[in-house]
Amino acid sequence: MRTSTIFSLLFLAASTVVPGCTCVARDAETYKADTRNVLETRNKTIKDCYDVALTTDPKLDGTVVVKFKVEKKTGKIIDTAVDTARTKAPESLSKCIVEAVDGLTLDPVDQRDGMATFSWTFKAAEPKPAE
């Protein structure tokens, strides 16, 4: 069984308030949790990305770290990019994950832009011992 584990989410929200906005003002922990929930809607797609990468390297382990912005006006995840200094996985896997999460939308939108870093750690399943 192959596993992928969501490793961490670091989230910093800017403190700009938009007057007349019908959006909410989440505290940092709620913003973090809500963003994590949106990203987790793509867990199957991200697992599929890893499964495709395993066809090239059945022992593939690694971490993909993605940075992005949550736009205050739309709640949309934008400017999604791999943190190459912290990512230890093939480019094809990283690109697939970026494509999976880019454009997701946090609803309801927040009064603040958010800057986030999210990491996925992948570990290939140990082969079953021969009987």
Residue ranges and their predicted role:
Residues 1-19:
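Sec-dependent bacterial lipoprotein signal peptides
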Residues 20-131:
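Charge-biased low-complexity segments
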